[in-house]
């Protein structure tokens, strides 16, 4: 098979730059009993398929998966992958777990939202929220940083241990028809 890392216009990306992973397999790819999802995951020419993973090749040719395309936040026309923000937040000594996703913003379409589970003994407060936002601003480009952070006693996880963002994100999109305002 073949693997390609492409931008939204199906152009190849240079080494080190993240993009959507597209593949060409020896046999046609399809989702079981879901022709619509199969069609959505196939390139216009019918040659390539994606399952929505985002990644890049390093200088040695190793593939790194960095996020899922469905988690991408589009804020003011900028594509933001939340994994980088999540990875940073969980390094803060007051953070036990973190989820980052897009929420509605009238001017930007979406804005970056953080939801954090604090370490035992740390109480949620406006001061802790400000500290975490400032921490992100020190280490990441401004557009990748949460504009606000909410606190949860525990973040939802699947039985496999994987973070389950959908119920968190759905709270903010409950009255919206689309993830793009």
Residue ranges and their predicted role:
Residues 4-5, 56, 156:
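Hydrophobic beta-strand positions
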Residues 170-181:
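Acidic/polar alpha-helix N-cap and adjacent early helical turns
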Residues 3, 98, 149-151:
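Generic structural signal for residues in well-ordered beta-strands
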Residues 2, 31-33:
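Adenylate-forming
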Residues 9-12, 22-25, 29-30, 39-40, ...:
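AMP-binding/adenylate-forming catalytic core of the ANL superfamily
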Residues 138-162, 181:
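AMP-binding/adenylate-forming catalytic domain of the ANL superfamily
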């Amino acid at each position: 098979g073949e693997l390609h890392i492409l931008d939204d216009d199906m152009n190849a990306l240079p080494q080190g730059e993240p993009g959507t992973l597209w593949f060409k397999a020896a046999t046609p790819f399809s989702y079981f009993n879901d022709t619509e999802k199969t069609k959505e995951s196939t390139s216009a020419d019918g040659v390539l398929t994606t399952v929505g993973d985002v990644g890049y090749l390093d200088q040695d040719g190793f593939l790194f998966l960095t996020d899922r395309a469905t988690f991408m936040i589009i804020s003011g026309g900028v594509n933001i992958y939340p994994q980088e923000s999540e990875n940073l937040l969980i390094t803060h000594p007051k953070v036990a777990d973190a989820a980052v996703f897009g929420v509605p913003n009238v001017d930007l379409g979406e804005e970056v939202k953080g939801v954090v589970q604090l370490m035992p003994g740390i109480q949620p407060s406006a001061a802790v929220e400000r500290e975490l936002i400032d921490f992100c601003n020190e280490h990441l480009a401004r557009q990748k940083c949460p504009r606000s952070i909410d606190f949860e006693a525990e973040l939802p996880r699947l039985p496999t241990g994987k973070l389950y963002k959908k119920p968190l994100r759905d709270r903010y999109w409950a009255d919206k028809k689309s993830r793009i305002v």
